[in-house]
């Protein structure tokens, strides 16, 4: 196979192939970030749906024009 500069840069990323962290690894951390992302999406949805009313935030199409 031909060696390229891009392959040399990306090789360290592939050197850990097949290795997994013992036990649950970073799964709890991933779950925490998924929960925070869910809360973020819910806040955005509530602002858009006008369920969460914020002073000075107008969610009409006219405000974008």
Swiss-Prot record:
Lumenal compartment residues: 45-65
Ranges annotated as spanning the membrane: 29-44
Alphabetical keyword list: Membrane, Photosynthesis, Photosystem II, Thylakoid, Transmembrane, Transmembrane helix
Molecular function as annotated in GO: phosphate ion binding
Record membrane topology: Single-pass membrane protein
Cytoplasmic topology ranges: 1-28
Quaternary data: PSII is composed of 1 copy each of membrane proteins PsbA, PsbB, PsbC, PsbD, PsbE, PsbF, PsbH, PsbI, PsbJ, PsbK, PsbL, PsbM, PsbT, PsbX, PsbY, PsbZ, Psb30/Ycf12, peripheral proteins PsbO, CyanoQ (PsbQ), PsbU, PsbV and a large number of cofactors. It forms dimeric complexes.
Family: Belongs to the PsbH family.
Main function: One of the components of the core complex of photosystem II (PSII), required for its stability and/or assembly. PSII is a light-driven water:plastoquinone oxidoreductase that uses light energy to abstract electrons from H(2)O, generating O(2) and a proton gradient subsequently used for ATP formation. It consists of a core antenna complex that captures photons, and an electron transfer chain that converts photonic excitation into a charge separation.
PANTHER family: PHOTOSYSTEM II REACTION CENTER PROTEIN H
NCBIfam families listed in its UniProt record: PRK02624.1
Protein's name according to its UniProt entry: Photosystem II reaction center protein H
């Amino acid at each position: 196979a031909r060696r390229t500069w891009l392959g040399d840069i990306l090789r360290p990323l592939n050197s850990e192939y097949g290795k997994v962290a013992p036990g649950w690894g970073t799964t709890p951390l991933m779950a925490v970030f998924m929960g925070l992302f869910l809360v973020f999406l819910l806040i955005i949805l509530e602002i858009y749906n006008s369920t969460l009313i914020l002073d000075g935030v107008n969610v009409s199409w006219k405000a974008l024009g």
